[in-house]
Amino acid sequence: MSDQPFQFDAARFINTLTKNGHNRLIGAQYHAHGDDWCELAIPYNPELVSDSATGILASGPIFTLMDMATSLSIWLKTGTIQPQATLDLRIDYLRPAKPGQTVIGHGECYHITRSIAFIRGHAHDGDPEKPIAHVAGTYFLTAS
């Protein structure tokens, strides 16, 4: 038995989550994380385009990306992996993603009560100062 305490490898864990289900289908990938935030990326994929004439990415993959990034930010903030459910996730689309660009989703958990986590975030395609979308919402911590 090792004398080293268990250390949660968030990058490895998040990378594993993006290899399954709808996150795999949209091509979500780990990008970066901190104590209360997570970034995921979706490389440009013509199969996710909503209009073949323009090459603009559909809104659904961006919503999925933001739901996953904000959800993971809660686990990072609490330091525990616990069941949770999206109560409300509002997304304001500011502009379409540029065709051919990777979309980065940044999610942050900024407050937690006994049973509710509050999140915010944004998606961009290379410049965080020119976001594609902003998100805000709440998650129910189902184990509470």
State what each model feature region is.
Residues 26, 36-38, 83-89, 101, ...:
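A generic structural signal for short beta-strands and their flanking turns/coil linkers
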